[in-house]
Regions:
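Multi-pass alpha-helical transmembrane bundles in non-GPCR membrane proteins
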Residues: 6-181
Length: 181
């Protein structure tokens, strides 16, 4: 069992598990957050060299949504506080799943699709995300199937513009899109 010394008035040995709720998840999600931050920099630099602010905006929305997901998850899995605080952290952690899915759609909708189709699809996905956020805010222990339906529904919204997405992307880019889910 991991042990460390807390320095202060008393020199006491405490287990890591007493202070960190889920060390494995806390560490891996923290690493994910750092990777998201480091990956955001070159993406935003590349976007800044493209014509129009829409590139930077769409990539920033994606990057921020990814960072927020990992930050919320790291926080939830790190701090073992009162039941009330843990419930709030769990709500935020679960809300960020909807934010990430919608954030992931943002560059596809604005940069790949564009126009009326892209804006419509973006509004649909962010609308579903808002429903998911509200459900998690007010019903954190809702049945898992409800969350699953929302997440899968958001993910499958792309079939509304599948042909246009397929025709607008290179085979390699489309392969990465499929690999990412």
């Amino acid at each position: 069992m991991s042990r460390f010394i807390i320095l202060g008035g008393n020199h006491m040995s405490h287990t890591l598990e007493e202070h960190i709720k889920d060390p494995g998840s806390a560490i891996t999600h923290f690493i994910g957050m750092l990777m998201a931050i480091f990956a955001a920099v070159p993406l935003l630099i590349k976007a800044a060299h493209e014509p129009g602010k829409i590139y930077v905006i769409s990539i920033a929305v994606y990057a921020v949504s990814l960072i927020l997901l990992y930050a919320a998850s790291t926080t939830y899995h790190t701090f073992n506080r009162s039941e009330k605080i843990n419930t709030v952290l769990k709500k935020v952690d679960h809300m960020m799943i909807s934010v990430l899915i919608a954030g992931s759609y943002t560059p596809i909708c604005l940069l790949v699709l564009g126009g009326r189709t892209g804006i419509t699809l973006l509004c649909i996905v962010w609308g579903i995300a808002l429903v998911g956020i509200l459900i998690k805010a007010f019903w954190v222990y809702c049945p898992k199937w409800i969350s699953s339906v929302l997440y899968i529904g958001m993910g499958w919204t792309c079939v509304l513009a599948f042909t246009q997405i397929l025709n607008s992307m290179s085979a390699a880019a489309f392969g990465w899109l499929l690999a990412g889910g």
